[in-house]
UniProtKB/Swiss-Prot annotation:
This is NAD(P)H dehydrogenase (quinone). It is an enzyme of class 1 (oxidoreductase). FMN binds at residues 10-15, 78-80, 113-119, 134. The keyword Nucleotide-binding applies. It comes from Caulobacter sp. (strain K31). Binds 1 FMN per monomer. GO terms for cellular component: membrane.
Amino acid sequence: MPKVLVLYYSAYGHIETMANAVAEGARAAGATVDIKRVPELVSEEIAKKSHYKLDQAAPIAKIDDLADYDAIIVGTGTRFGRMSSQMAAFLDQAGGLWARGALNGKVGAAFTSSATQHGGNETTLFSIITNLLHFGLTIVGLPYSHAGQMTLEEITGGAPYGATTIAGGDGSRQPSQIELDGARHQGELVAKTAAKLFG
């Protein structure tokens, strides 16, 4: 039974919701799953003024936690076409793990959100995936076996590189059923891939 970490940063709750769906998919495939978040860099005062969602249940991750898992699925909102500074600052601390090869051969994946359809989801996925490849992870995307990402019936996230959601400019749009199904599907695929590699 593979051990999977869903590691995320969520300012407004959209990625937290996606992280829970990713975890559901991995658990459905038989994995043991932990959901953890990275530390907030913004002061509590500014976070409150900006209406950040501060009541998130997931515990704060420590960088050495990464070595304890067979698979690591990373999610963060898009910040100007790349991952958030909170996630980048966390992953930048993994130099010691990288130097020891502690993450080599693990399974990795990425998911994200943006305000608009063309708001940088794919480039953000690439920024996460690039980090994971440098760490030595084998990447699992979101293939078109998740047919929902092909729909033209509604605005929806999803890319072959990872699950995505679109939050809207004011953050009022929550992840749709199609987007949550994509997140679950990706979590399931990661768990199945890790099971093949690690038993």
